[in-house]
């Protein structure tokens, strides 16, 4: 059974179980972090795959095969094989077997890459990429300079988003689709993410309506309008995300790795 914890309360050091001298596994340029029980970060694997929301961990966890595998593995090991941590450094962390199965669900080629990397990590064969020659060292220095330049450019481009986050506490509610544009996300992507994470209702006549707990917390407002048609009356729902909700959701998206934190320039 998947459990959720608050990362700030339950993990004093996300890499507590890892020897500081040991190189963490890196796949496609993404560091695959672990929790102190040695479970692997599925969100990091998703980022390494380079694929969209349809291959996110939440989608895999909905499949019958994933549920059955988790149940059997937890019976066998007598431990929690998959957990979710909220807050800084959070995410969904899973037993190595589950992480490899998730990678296989993404693609067979990705499974092979992940499995070999985990084997190298477990057996201590994982080595940092140290330049072996002057040209390699120069190439590494150039790559680091390019990365620094790209980050600086992104900070300049994203500064309005950060300033927006500082203003929204007192702002009136906005439509979710408009908020997605402000964040630089696709409207459909944000709605899918909100449904996958249990914030919006996923099916039925109230699809895309916030669940009551999030309305009660003051994150959303809901307006119901009765519309008369030739086929009778129907209810239309208009959802707005409040200033409080905008700050809360931005933090959730940052914690999930959907948004990348940047610093505002003055």
Swiss-Prot record:
Gene assigned in the entry: kilA
Protein's job: Not essential for vegetative replication. Either interferes with plasmid establishment after transformation or is lethal to cells. May be related or lytic development of P1.
InterPro entries, per database record: Ant_C (IPR005039), KilA/APSES_HTH (IPR018004), KilA_N (IPR017880)
UniProt DNA-binding region: 176-195
Start and end residues of each KilA-N domain: 21-121
Keywords attached to this entry: DNA-binding
Protein known as: Protein kilA
Organism listed in the record: Escherichia phage P1 (Bacteriophage P1)
One annotated GO molecular function: DNA binding
């Amino acid at each position: 059974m998947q459990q959720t914890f608050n990362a700030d309360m339950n993990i004093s050091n996300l890499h507590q179980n890892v020897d500081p001298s040991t190189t963490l596994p890196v796949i496609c340029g993404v560091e695959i972090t672990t929790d102190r029980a040695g479970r692997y970060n599925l969100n990091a694997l998703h980022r390494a795959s380079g694929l969209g929301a349809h291959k996110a961990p939440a989608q895999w966890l909905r499949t019958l095969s994933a549920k059955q595998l988790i149940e059997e593995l937890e019976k066998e090991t007598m431990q929690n094989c998959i957990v979710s941590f909220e807050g800084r450094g959070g995410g969904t962390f899973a037993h190595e077997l589950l992480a490899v199965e998730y990678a296989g669900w993404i693609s067979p080629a990705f499974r092979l890459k992940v499995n070999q990397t985990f084997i190298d990590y477990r057996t201590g064969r994982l080595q940092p990429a140290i330049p072996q020659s002057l040209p390699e060292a120069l190439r590494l220095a150039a790559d680091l300079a390019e990365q620094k330049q790209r980050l600086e450019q992104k900070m300049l481009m994203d500064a309005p988003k950060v300033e927006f986050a500082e203003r929204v506490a007192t702002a009136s509610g906005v439509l979710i689709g408009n908020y997605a544009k402000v964040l630089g996300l696709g409207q459909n992507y944000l709605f899918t993410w909100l449904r996958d994470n249990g914030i919006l209702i996923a099916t039925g006549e109230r699809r895309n309506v916030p669940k009551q707990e999030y309305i009660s917390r003051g994150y959303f407002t809901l307006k119901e309008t009765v519309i008369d048609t030739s086929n009778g009356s129907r209810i239309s729902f208009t959802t707005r995300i409040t200033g409080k909700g905008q700050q809360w959701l931005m933090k959730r998206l940052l914690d999930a790795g959907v948004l990348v934190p940047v610093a505002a320039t003055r």
